[in-house]
From Swiss-Prot:
Reaction(s) catalysed (UniProt annotation): [protein]-L-glutamate 5-O-methyl ester + H2O = L-glutamyl-[protein] + methanol + H(+); L-glutaminyl-[protein] + H2O = L-glutamyl-[protein] + NH4(+)
Top EC class of this enzyme: hydrolase
Record EC number: 3.1.1.61, 3.5.1.44
Job description of the protein: Involved in chemotaxis. Part of a chemotaxis signal transduction system that modulates chemotaxis in response to various stimuli. Catalyzes the demethylation of specific methylglutamate residues introduced into the chemoreceptors (methyl-accepting chemotaxis proteins or MCP) by CheR. Also mediates the irreversible deamidation of specific glutamine residues to glutamic acid.
Modified residues (4-aspartylphosphate): 61
InterPro entries: CheB-like, CheB_C, CheY-like_superfamily, Sig_transdc_resp-reg_Me-estase, Sig_transdc_resp-reg_receiver
Residues in Response regulatory domain copies: 10-127
Identification of the protein by name: Protein-glutamate methylesterase/protein-glutamine glutaminase 1
GO biological process, one term: chemotaxis
The family this protein is said to belong to: Belongs to the CheB family.
The CheB-type methylesterase domain, residue ranges: 159-353
Length: 357
């Protein structure tokens, strides 16, 4: 129930294209629990209508006249925060801007498509994200306030030479959550770090890697097929591919697989978890941060059963508690920590794996 006395999800549509505003209205029209609160044709109008209409969710374009989407996101999130979903193109520039919007406080994005064949897919993704994000509003707003927290790099004491690996899984809310975790990992971490962030095929993961690399001591890169795995490097799975690891003749390499989605996503956490078990066995430290659905639940259970160490983000600091909750329910989690304590826990668990304590 919202402040207007109904249980519908009041949505504000922001796009400078009248055609696109109408298209989004049409996509949402068949959802009985979603109500269009209004629309806006630029960022300034979005800021004004956000204040006057008090929507539950805002769908925001990036490139608009008068005030662009990035400025509007920053203004709204600094004054009267509302969950914002960016509606962005899959171009290099569009990917960069969408990622910047996520860093400024937007919760998620849905990629635009010029093909009419993708309309049903976009509609489903948009509706699913509106519903899931709306159901998590309190956690989202808490996390927005916590983004001001910038901790120091966590130092560890190591006596091994990279006999273990770290896995981090995330989805909705992942880019901002990853920014709370990866830059605080030490540059001398004697293990590779594999990151599966649910992203569509395109340029988003590359832009994410470049952003995190700028902020971190570790080297962060988008993973490439057949690349040799090196300790101290963070490999982010590219969108549209499952990332796996395979060891042959004493050398571990990344294998990118173009196949069917698992849990409706590609890359999937469960896929790399399975392959990591084959290579690293019990010598895995795994953290699941945020996201819808249950990807990672089965994989984390197998990692824990094999003797690996697993962490889930706490509900009160998680954007979307679906994936962590599913992993906890499956019995796949050793410890639950607030997002800002996860770097310390990764380092602590890594010390145990590395030093055999």
């Amino acid at each position: 129930m919202n402040e207007f006395g109904d249980s519908m999800i009041r949505t504000l549509i922001v796009d400078d294209s009248a055609f696109m505003r109408m298209a989004i209205r049409s996509m949402l029209a068949s959802s009985p629990d979603i109500k269009i609160a209004g629309d806006a044709c630029n960022g300034k109008e979005a800021v004004d209508k956000s204040k006057s209409l008090h929507p539950d969710i805002i769908i925001m374009d990036v490139n608009m006249p008068v005030m662009d989407g990035l400025t509007a996101v920053k203004t709204i999130m600094s004054t009267d925060p509302v969950p914002i979903i960016m509606f962005s193109t899959l171009t290099v520039e569009g990917s960069k801007e969408a990622l910047e919007a996520l860093q400024l406080g937007a919760i998620d994005f849905v990629p635009k498509s010029e093909s009419h064949h993708d309309v049903n897919k976009i509609e489903k993704e948009l509706v699913d994200k509106i519903r899931n994000i709306h159901s998590s509003n309190p956690s989202i707003l808490r996390l927005i306030n916590m983004r001001k927290f910038k901790g120091e790099v966590v130092r560890g004491k190591w006596s091994c030479a990279g006999d273990f690996a770290v896995l981090i899984g995330s989805s909705t809310g992942g880019p901002s959550s990853l920014e709370q975790v990866i830059p605080r990992l030490p540059g001398d971490l004697p293990a590779p770090v594999f990151v599966v962030q649910h992203m569509p095929e395109g340029n988003f993961c590359k832009q994410l890697a470049e952003r995190l690399n700028f902020l971190s001591e570790l080297e962060i890169k988008e993973a490439r097929n057949n690349e040799k795995v090196t300790a101290g490097v963070v490999y982010i799975a590219p969108g549209g591919y499952h990332m796996t690891v395979k060891k042959a003749l004493g050398v571990t390499r990344i294998k990118l697989i173009k196949s069917q989605p698992v849990h409706a996503v590609m890359p999937a956490v469960d896929v790399i978890a399975e392959s990591m078990l084959d290579v690293y066995g019990k010598n895995i430290v795994a953290a699941i941060l945020t996201g819808m659905g249950f990807d990672g639940a089965a994989g984390f259970k197998k990692i824990r059963d094999a003797g690996g160490s697993t962490i889930a983000c706490s509900e009160d600091t998680c954007v979307i508690f679906g994936m962590p909750k599913a992993a906890i329910a499956a019995g796949g989690i050793d410890t639950v920590k607030p997002i800002f304590e996860i770097p310390e826990e990764i380092v602590r668990m890594s010390e145990v794996k590395c030093n055999g304590k």
